[in-house]
């Protein structure tokens, strides 16, 4: 019986590598493609555009004796290097600046949450989207009527900015 158990153990250990992956079980902190929505009060159209954001897992620790000791600071996935892209919202009322700037992640790293450029809140029940008026996907085939060309939706990005 012991020999059978040993043989079974060897068989399980030798085939265990076939199930294991060299990649981490959860994706680590890195830039990922995302669709964000841009809107502004006074502009009737919400524009969705593709960008990169920082997302993924950072290692963290939890104290066993939480009631006695203070909680440990938790790492979150932050922007390391970023640049800003300007999106022009079509159909804005006169006197309303139609340009909205959005971040584009160039690189990411784990660290303490910095409220100056990160959303440190918990998960939301609803996805981020437009609160005002109509929705216009920047990748749709039909651009808004008042644009002379679809390239007016995206303006050139500023040079890279490294948050402090």
Curated annotation (Swiss-Prot):
What does the record give as the organism's lineage? Eukaryota, Metazoa, Chordata, Craniata, Vertebrata
Q: Which residues form the signal peptide?
A: 1-20
Q: Where are the transmembrane segments?
A: none
Name of the protein described by the UniProt record: Choriogonadotropin subunit beta
GO BP annotations, alphabetical order: G protein-coupled receptor signaling pathway
Record-linked InterPro entries: Cystine-knot_cytokine (IPR029034), Glyco_hormone_CN (IPR006208), Gonadotropin_bsu (IPR001545), Gonadotropin_bsu_CS (IPR018245)
Quaternary structure and partners: Heterodimer of a common alpha chain and a unique beta chain which confers biological specificity to thyrotropin, lutropin, follitropin and gonadotropin.
* Keywords annotated in UniProt: Disulfide bond, Glycoprotein, Hormone, Secreted, Signal
Positions annotated with a glycan in the UniProt record: 50, 140, 146, 151
User: What is the predominant subcellular site recorded for this chain?
Assistant: secreted
Please list where the region (Disordered) is annotated.
135-164
Originating species: Callithrix jacchus (White-tufted-ear marmoset)
List cellular component terms (GO).
cytoplasm; extracellular space
Give the similarity note: Belongs to the glycoprotein hormones subunit beta family.
* Known function: Stimulates the ovaries to synthesize the steroids that are essential for the maintenance of pregnancy.
Give a GO molecular function annotation for the protein.
hormone activity
Pfam families from the UniProt entry: Cys_knot (PF00007)
Q: Where in the cell is it found?
A: Secreted
Give a brief account of the tissues where this protein occurs: Placenta.
| SUPFAM superfamilies for the chain | Cystine-knot cytokines
- List the PANTHER family hit by this protein, alphabetically: GLYCOPROTEIN HORMONE BETA CHAIN (PTHR11515), LUTROPIN SUBUNIT BETA (PTHR11515:SF11)
SMART domains tied to this protein: GHB (SM00068)
Q: List the disulfide bonds.
A: 29-77, 43-92, 46-130, 54-108, 58-110, 113-120
């Amino acid at each position: 019986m012991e020999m059978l158990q040993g043989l079974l153990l060897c068989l399980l250990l030798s085939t265990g590598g076939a199930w294991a992956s060299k990649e981490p079980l959860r994706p680590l902190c890195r830039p990922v493609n995302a669709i964000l929505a841009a809107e502004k009060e006074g502009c009737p159209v919400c524009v969705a555009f593709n960008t990169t954001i920082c997302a993924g897992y950072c290692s963290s620790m939890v104290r066993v004796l939480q009631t006695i000791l203070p909680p440990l600071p938790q790492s979150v996935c932050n922007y390391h290097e970023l640049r800003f892209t300007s999106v022009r919202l079509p159909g804005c009322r006169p006197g309303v600046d139609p340009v909205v700037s959005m971040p584009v992640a160039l690189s990411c790293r784990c660290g303490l949450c910095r409220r100056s450029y990160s959303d440190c809140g918990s998960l939301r029940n609803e996805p981020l989207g437009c609160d005002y008026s109509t929705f216009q996907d920047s990748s749709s085939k039909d651009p808004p009527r008042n644009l002379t060309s679809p390239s007016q939706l995206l303006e050139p990005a500023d040079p890279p900015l490294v948050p402090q």
